[in-house]
């Protein structure tokens, strides 16, 4: 099964839908997870039809912030388990194996991290079996995942590191561009980080 995850930072522009369509054409995923759609249900229904997906679970944006969507093709056996403003969780039956797939958006603001990550941990700990998470975690695991800016360690809790360590999960790695986010000014003053990834428990 091929799965595509993307922090689209708003899906209301035709150019963004075209860019997503190009990615889908190249990767040919059966499942797509979008975060920060900044869109309501009717807009996501239109996007789903444009991209030729058959079913979806949508968490609407609040005003012009947030918004999640998981879309899948006909023939993919998916049952929605749970959803909130930070995650969509589904059970996937794939070749006689049932596993949990979670599309996750980790809030960048410290005041909102504890609740979002607490919900994620509770969901994973209640599931008996295999699981995988994809999305924008808004954390780096080590200094090699950042280029530029202050690379000093933070005393704040890194929930992604806790997830990898406490639940014996693994980072699924990447191909292509190492960094998925660029902030600050362009050029030497810019900061690049790997915030988007896939994480799974494989045994």
Model-derived segments and spans:
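A shared catalytic/ligand-binding motif for oxyanion handling
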Residues: 1-203
């Amino acid at each position: 099964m091929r799965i595509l995850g993307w922090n689209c930072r708003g899906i209301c522009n035709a150019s963004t839908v075209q860019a997503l369509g190009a990615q889908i054409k190249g990767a040919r995923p059966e499942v797509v997870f979008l975060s920060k759609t900044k869109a309501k249900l009717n807009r996501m229904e239109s996007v789903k039809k444009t991209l030729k997906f058959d079913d979806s679970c949508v968490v609407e944006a609040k005003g012009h912030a947030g918004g999640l969507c998981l879309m899948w093709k006909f023939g993919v056996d998916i049952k929605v388990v749970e959803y909130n403003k930070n995650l969509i969780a589904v059970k996937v039956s794939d070749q006689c194996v049932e596993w949990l797939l979670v599309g996750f958006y980790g809030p960048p603001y410290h005041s909102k991290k504890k609740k979002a990550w607490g919900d994620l941990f509770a969901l994973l700990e209640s599931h008996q079996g295999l699981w995988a998470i994809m999305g924008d975690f808004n954390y780096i695991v080590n200094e090699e995942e950042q280029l530029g800016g202050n690379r000093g360690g933070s005393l704040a809790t890194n929930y992604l590191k806790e997830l990898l360590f406490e639940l014996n999960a693994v980072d699924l790695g990447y191909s292509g561009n190492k960094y998925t986010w660029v902030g600050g000014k362009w050029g030497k003053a810019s900061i690049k980080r790997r915030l988007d990834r896939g994480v799974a428990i494989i045994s």
